[in-house]
């Protein structure tokens, strides 16, 4: 019984940050155009993570895109700037997106 409790606590500790970042993405309206595993208006976060995989400065590059927007990378629909997202929030969201496998 004790081992089961430890396993549950460990799982909760790992999943808590995932839920926090998903909540932040929802609060900042990211989820209006993106989903974790499927393309909506914009690419899935899984696809974004794959595109930036292995790049040393991926968190900073993606954070800049989240704040300033961009166009031409994922098709004809541009991503608008997101002035409601602070630099710290953008980096937190970027790290979360890049962790998705």
Give short role names for the model-derived ranges.
Residues 96-100:
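C-terminal alpha-helix
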Residues 51-61:
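Short microdomains enriched in Cys/His and/or Lys/Arg
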Residues 19-36:
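Sequence/structural segment immediately N-terminal to covalent heme-attachment motifs in c-type
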Residues 32, 41-52, 65-94:
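Axial heme c-ligation environment in periplasmic c-type cytochrome domains
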Residues 1-21, 101:
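N-terminal export/targeting leaders of redox proteins
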């Amino acid at each position: 019984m004790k081992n089961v409790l430890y396993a549950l606590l460990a799982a909760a500790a790992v999943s808590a940050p995932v839920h926090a970042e998903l909540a932040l993405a929802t609060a900042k309206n990211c989820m209006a155009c993106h989903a974790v595993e499927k393309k909506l208006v914009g690419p899935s976060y899984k696809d974004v993570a794959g595109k930036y995989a292995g790049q040393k400065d991926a968190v900073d590059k993606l954070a800049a895109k989240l704040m300033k927007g961009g166009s031409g990378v994922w098709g004809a629909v541009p991503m608008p700037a997101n002035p409601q997202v602070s630099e710290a929030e953008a980096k937190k969201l970027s790290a979360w997106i890049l962790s998705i496998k």
